[in-house]
């Protein structure tokens, strides 16, 4: 339905784009990812726009649709780097699961897919797809729809920034201690204060 599609595009955050998105129809695409079922659905949706190839070496661009930064995902990035192919990372995640600095730095573009319509009443139906639909993802990759989401939490880009983030304030990652303490004092006095970004 239209509302669900709108929610999917409005909850997708374009974290990075090194002038690769939107993709072009003449580009050959290799699709890989965490789930073979998701990859199969993505291939079918992307094939409406471009040629999907079965080998990374034959591709102009790689679409990596993953749910975690695990060994398989890191190996995919290494293989793409060896083949000198740009990666568009489509990362299904949320507050507790986000792309790390390695993933972002290894990608030419990053779409952070935060949409999840999992039932919250303790049960779910088998084979019920509850993430961003492959057709909506393909539309965003090819510029038919625009991702317009924003994060409601911070993401540290370096491990040093992550260590410096105290976790209780937004927008304090990487700021100096004096500014961070000032921000904490402002929020303590007025919890609804707008902090500079």
What are these regions (language model features)?
Residues 2-197:
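C-terminal non-catalytic regions of proteins with extracellular/luminal or membrane-system context
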């Amino acid at each position: 339905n239209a509302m669900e599609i709108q929610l999917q595009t409005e909850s997708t955050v374009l974290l990075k784009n090194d002038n690769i998105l939107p993709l072009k129809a003449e580009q050959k695409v290799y699709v890989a990812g965490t789930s073979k079922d998701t990859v199969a659905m993505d291939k079918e949706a992307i094939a409406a726009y471009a040629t999907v190839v079965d080998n990374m070496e034959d591709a102009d661009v790689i679409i990596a649709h993953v749910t975690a930064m695990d060994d398989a995902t890191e190996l995919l990035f290494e293989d793409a780097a060896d083949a000198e192919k740009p990666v568009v990372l489509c990362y299904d995640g949320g507050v507790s699961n986000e792309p790390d600095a390695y993933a972002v730095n290894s990608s030419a573009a990053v779409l952070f897919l935060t949409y999840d319509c999992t039932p919250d009443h303790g049960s779910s139906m088998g084979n019920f797809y509850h993430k961003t639909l492959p057709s909506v993802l393909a539309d965003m990759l090819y510029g038919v729809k625009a991702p317009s989401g924003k994060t409601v939490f911070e993401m540290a880009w370096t491990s040093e920034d992550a260590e410096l983030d105290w976790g209780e304030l937004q927008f304090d990652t990487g700021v100096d201690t004096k500014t961070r303490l000032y921000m904490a004092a402002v929020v303590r006095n007025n919890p609804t204060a707008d902090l500079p970004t």
